[in-house]
């Protein structure tokens, strides 16, 4: 059984056919878009609903922009994957892109090492809410 790697553009949808040899855990990870943003090569990324974004801020601050027209129930997860000097050294800015975050009109700064948040879009009045996190309120 041969393996082939194919580069895909950001936000691409993929249909995977398997003869049963791909573990279910691998397919589950592929269901949502997992992307890694490394500050040494990229300092901005625009999320799409369902994204799970690993952010490495070892070199610079990174800005993750939330989807522009979210639907109720859309989720985006952002996590610090820096080996050292993560969000505590160079923060990750979550740009609201026109929607509110926790009912407010300010962007969200993630500035603690090992921080991980899942944001879920609720309503236009409340906007993005923190569904689960180690984010201290």
List the predicted regions and their residue ranges.
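Exposed extracellular interaction/assembly regions and N-terminal maturation sites
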Residues: 1, 22-96, 124-137
């Amino acid at each position: 059984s041969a393996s082939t790697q194919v580069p895909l553009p950001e936000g691409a949808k993929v249909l995977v056919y398997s003869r049963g040899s791909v573990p279910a855990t691998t397919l589950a990870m592929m269901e949502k878009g997992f992307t890694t943003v490394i500050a040494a090569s990229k300092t901005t990324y625009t999320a799409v609903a369902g994204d799970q974004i690993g952010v490495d801020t070892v070199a610079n601050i990174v800005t993750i922009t939330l989807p522009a027209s979210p639907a109720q129930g859309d989720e985006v997860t952002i996590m610090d994957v820096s080996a050292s000097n993560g969000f505590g050294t160079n923060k990750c800015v979550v740009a609201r892109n026109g929607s509110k975050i926790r009912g407010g009109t300010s962007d969200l700064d993630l500035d603690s090492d090992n921080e991980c948040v899942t944001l879920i879009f609720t309503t236009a009045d409340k906007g993005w809410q923190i569904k689960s996190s180690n984010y201290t309120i």
